[in-house]
Amino acid sequence: MESATPRCAELHSPPHWRVVDFISDLHLQASEPETFEAWAQYMAHTPADAVLILGDLFEVWVGDDAALEPTSFEARCAAVLCSTAQTKAVYFMHGNRDFLVGPAFLQACQVTGLDDPTALNFAGQRWLLSHGDALCLDDVDYLQFRAQVRSPQWQQHFLAQPLEQRRAIARNIRTQSESRKHAGTVYADVDSTAACQWLQAAHASTLIHGHTHRPAEHDLGNGLHSTVLSDWDLAATPHRAEVLRLTDSGLQRIPLA
């Protein structure tokens, strides 16, 4: 099980940052072009000085070499990231679906990796950022799986397989994911006690996270709060696509769907 208080990285916003956007759980995949197009349009037109992606940008990631195929979906996603990074800072945190995104891909796209968790210092306040999956302590089976696939040994073994074999495994994962979606599988929620411990250790008052697909604000007591990001699904009815925007006035949800 995850440590209740993991080491917290630091991100200090430069003085020129006025607008910071947070997104997560887009689960980009070739079979859902509407969501990809909405994301590409958002990335091209957001007024933010920085876009912080807090996990699960991709439905699955089978290795950085997938983006080297010029006609691949991964290459199209890389092009969007590269283009956005020319005009604003782009940061990426691993989620439970895209934990194999590597430094080679991020460097090629001029995207900066974010540790989970990271404390953002912005406008005189500290905001704790996490994907959120490590805080879902009731999901014991998942946390065991997470520990396995995050190990260097497992990742080295998986990435040593041919790309097409890894893609086949990914297709199987997507099939299972669709089955869970249609079955109405409910995501485990963040453990509020653990969230408070993380916040206190980071000397922050608000946790911003994704993963659970339950956008909301929660009062955790003792002046501590959590804000949950929305997932994106432009094929759903109604559409779901939302940005959490931070300025010196605070947080604001920006619906895109």
Can you say where each PLM-predicted feature lies in the sequence?
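A short, compositionally biased domain-edge/stem linker segment
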Residues: 1-13
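Core catalytic region of metal-dependent phosphoesterases/phosphodiesterases
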Residues: 7, 16-19, 28-122
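Short, basic/glycine-rich phosphate-binding loops at helix/coil junctions
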Residues: 18, 22, 56-61, 166-178
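Hydrophobic "anchor" residues on beta-strands that sit immediately upstream
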Residues: 21-23, 51-52, 91, 127, ...
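Active-site metal-binding loops of divalent metal-dependent hydrolases
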Residues: 24-27, 56-57, 96-98, 132-134, ...
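Conserved beta-sheet core of the metallophosphoesterase superfamily
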Residues: 108-117, 126-128, 133, 139-140, ...
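Active-site-proximal loop/helix segment associated with metal-binding centers of metalloenzymes
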Residues: 130-191
